Amino acid sequence: MDPNCSCPTGGSCSCAGSCTCKACRCTSCKKSCCSCCPVGCAKCAQGCICKGASDKCSCCA
């Protein structure tokens, strides 16, 4: 299991609930791999379950 979840777009991968996933592009773990979500982040709200707040969110960049 890759802690960064760097699998191909549309691919599948295993992601633990504590996964930090900075490159969550695969469909099987996309919704559980967003580790941060600042207020007003539209992209996070559309496809990621937020696990904390941060000013720097990889899925919002």
Curated annotation (Swiss-Prot):
Superkingdom classification of source: Eukaryota
Species lineage: Eukaryota, Metazoa, Chordata, Craniata, Vertebrata
Region (Alpha): 30-61
Keywords: Acetylation, Metal-binding, Metal-thiolate cluster
Record: residues binding a divalent metal cation 6: C37, C41, C44, C60
Positions contributing to a divalent metal cation 4 binding: C33, C34, C44, C48
Sequence segments annotated as region (Beta): 1-29
Alphabetical GO biological process terms: cellular response to cadmium ion; cellular response to copper ion; cellular response to zinc ion; detoxification of copper ion; intracellular zinc ion homeostasis; negative regulation of growth
GO cellular component, one term: nucleus
Chain positions recorded as a divalent metal cation 5 binding sites: C34, C36, C37, C50
Protein residues bound to a divalent metal cation 7: C50, C57, C59, C60
InterPro entries: Metalthion_dom_sf, Metalthion_dom_sf_vert, Metalthion_vert, Metalthion_vert_metal_BS
Keyword Acetylation among record annotations: yes
Function: Metallothioneins have a high content of cysteine residues that bind various heavy metals; these proteins are transcriptionally regulated by both heavy metals and glucocorticoids.
Protein name as annotated: Metallothionein-1E
Residues reported to bind a divalent metal cation 1: C5, C7, C21, C24
Similarity comment: family membership: Belongs to the metallothionein superfamily. Type 1 family.
Record note on quaternary structure: Monomer.
